[in-house]
């Protein structure tokens, strides 16, 4: 159910791979996928119930009421009837079970479930030894939580340019940003695309830096965490896998790091010793037992939902290829190191606002620029003092062109057809083709 396996499965179901027997691993993340594959092989008809000529008038970008299915709601309600009478809402066996299941799925020795992805990054940085004034190399096009975790601890974000094709930090730009104060590299797997972690790890080793990866949009990536000291995740309901609230996790193979993360996540207390502090301070950042119980139910849908995202991305890329071939848009590459949290395209900067407006007004299609302001272009006193002269050429150009199309597991193919139809009409109109 990881990204590489899902790509192979997609090719198999499309008939592009012959003579290979595929086995779906018997694990909790594959539970719903295994049930579907027993009955269905036609993706469009059986997985999406495609009705080609069904009329669509409105296409929402990411409607919160459709990020959880009726089946998931039923499963969650069933498990809540077991948890609520116990009164164990904060600590309990579901939390321990959730961490074990996630550890197995990620192939990491230790997982510490937290109350958010932001807390996971903060705790990870502290466990790795961040001190006030330490520099942390990162991209500038992520959600503010990435930089806020660094700033809250007294660290100094050092923004580095991206690879404009992937939207992820460009490893070739990292070395020139390293100073005697640099202690960390913090890559972000933006939109679900895996950063170039092997090269980043090599740079970190050469300069004796720690690597903590923001994988809040990257659950399901093959080899996630392989080249990082600590991996951080978010289970916000908008993510590929979410609970019914806010939560996150830290993953590592290092026992001492895991122990320190546990201490920072719960008031600095010694592990399994009541109220005995062994570090100066800690946070109230443990994931709730109640959310863990919900997470165990929703985890059953993870592989199925990530496969749906992959299929929808593949379908967008295929159907919009004509616009790309004519140089009217730029599409992301379909690859096995992507879990398609978001689907970004690039359009001409001067046309973007008109395209978004006309898609909405003429076709009922909502699009978005998911992170509208880059980190080094915020108007805060800190940014104006420290980063006002910073120029990140590729980051800024890509940001001025990016446009996000609707994509989520409950997104229908009829809705996708409407998006494609609208894009062809509006973009050709904009450039007078």
PLM feature spans:
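Structural preference for beta-strand elements that scaffold enzyme active sites
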Residues: 210-212, 230, 402-404
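Short beta-strand-to-turn element immediately C-terminal to the catalytic PLP-Schiff-base lysine
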Residues: 233-234, 248-253, 296
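Short, acidic/turn-prone active-site loops that include or flank metal/cofactor-
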Residues: 162-166, 217, 237-238, 372-374
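PLP-dependent aminotransferase class I/II
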Residues: 26, 36, 40-49, 54, ...
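Conserved PLP-binding active-site segment in aminotransferase class I/II-type PLP enzymes
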Residues: 5-123, 127, 131, 400, ...
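PLP-dependent aminotransferase-like
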Residues: 43, 126-215
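Structural detector of well-ordered beta-strand residues that form the stable sheet scaffold
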Residues: 112, 137, 158, 211-212, ...
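Conserved active-site segment immediately N-terminal to the catalytic lysine
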Residues: 213-244, 272-277
């Amino acid at each position: 159910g990881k990204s590489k396996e899902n790509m192979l499965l997609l090719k198999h179901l499309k008939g592009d791979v012959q003579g290979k027997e595929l086995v779906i691993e018997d694990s909790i993340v594959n539970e719903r996928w295994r049930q579907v594959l027993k009955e269905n092989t036609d993706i469009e008809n059986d997985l999406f119930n495609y009705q080609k000529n069904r009329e669509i008038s409105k296409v929402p970008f990411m409607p919160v009421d459709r990020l959880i299915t009726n089946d998931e709601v039923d499963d969650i309600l069933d498990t809540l009837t077991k948890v609520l009478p116990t009164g164990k809402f904060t600590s309990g066996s579901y939390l321990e079970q959730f961490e074990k299941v996630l550890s197995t799925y990620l192939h990491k020795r230790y997982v510490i479930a937290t109350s958010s992805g932001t807390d996971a990054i903060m705790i990870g940085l502290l466990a790795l030894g961040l001190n006030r004034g330490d520099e942390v190399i990162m991209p500038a096009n992520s959600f503010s939580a990435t930089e806020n975790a660094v700033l809250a601890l007294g660290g100094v974000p050092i923004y580095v340019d991206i690879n404009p094709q992937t939207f992820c930090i460009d490893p070739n730009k990292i070395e020139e940003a390293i100073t005697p104060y640099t202690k960390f590299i913090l890559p972000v797997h933006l939109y679900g695309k895996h950063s170039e972690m092997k090269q980043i790890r090599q740079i970190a080793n050469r300069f004796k830096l720690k690597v903590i990866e923001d994988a809040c949009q990257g659950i399901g990536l093959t080899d996630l965490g392989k080249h990082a000291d600590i991996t951080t995740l978010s289970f916000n309901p908008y993510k590929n896998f979410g609970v019914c609230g806010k939560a996150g996790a830290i993953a590592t193979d290092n026992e001492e790091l895991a122990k320190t993360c546990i201490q920072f996540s719960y008031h600095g207390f010694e592990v399994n010793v009541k109220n005995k502090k062994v570090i100066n301070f800690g946070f109230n950042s443990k994931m709730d037992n109640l959310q863990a119980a919900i997470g165990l139910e929703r985890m059953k849908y993870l592989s199925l939902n990530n496969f749906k995202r992959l299929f929808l991305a593949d379908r967008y890329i295929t159907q919009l290829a004509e616009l790309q071939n004519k140089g009217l848009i730029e599409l992301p590459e379909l690859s096995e190191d992507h879990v398609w949290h978001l689907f970004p395209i690039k359009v001409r900067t001067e046309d973007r606002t008109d395209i978004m407006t006309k898609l909405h007004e003429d076709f009922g299609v909502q699009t978005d620029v998911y992170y509208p302001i880059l980190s080094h272009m915020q108007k805060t006193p800190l940014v104006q003092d420290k980063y006002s002269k910073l120029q990140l050429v590729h980051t800024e150009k890509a940001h001025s062109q990016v446009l996000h199309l609707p994509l989520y597991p409950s997104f229908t193919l009829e809705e996708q057809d409407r998006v494609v139809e609208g894009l062809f009409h509006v973009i050709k109109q904009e450039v007078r083709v």
